[in-house]
Amino acid sequence: MLLLALPVFPFVGCEPRTDNGSSVEPISLYEKIGGVWNLSDMRQIDETAKAAGLSVTEVNLYAQFEFPSLVIDLTTEGNQPTTYQVSGTAPELFPNAGYWELNTPFPAADGTAPKILLFADAAKTAKIGELNIISVPGAVEAMELRLTRTADGVPFVSYIYKLVK
């Protein structure tokens, strides 16, 4: 009798469970990027000199001017972007307040860097700026943003913001 029951034991208590992720929302970039960020470094890159192959193309503005504070607050509500607010003593390079969203809520499969799009209105129809995310926060809560100024579509200066939570 015991020999007849042995082949059945491996199947008792087994319940087929497939973890396909359908019960959990995927982690979006909003979860990583939203929040209060403090400036830890700021560099200016002369894109014209860089394109011409000149040696002096980068200036560390943070060390040179010793900005006591710069805080960027990217507010989210229910994992959706709402407003942003910039405070501190660094020069204003983009509007200090408005609304924001990412050009994509998830990392791109082709490795394209996400962008923070800045808007003047809550409907997000009047775009007032764009920040390229060069370094997305992960295990280390640090992020790098690039703001590039152009003239007739040609970049002439970029600012790199290194931020920490």
Label the predicted regions.
Residues E15-P95, P105-K165:
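Lipid interaction determinants
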Residues P10-G13:
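C-terminal motif of bacterial Sec signal peptides marking the signal peptidase cleavage site
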Residues M1-P7:
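Sec-dependent N-terminal signal peptides
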Residues G98-E101:
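Short beta-strand-centered aromatic/proline hotspots
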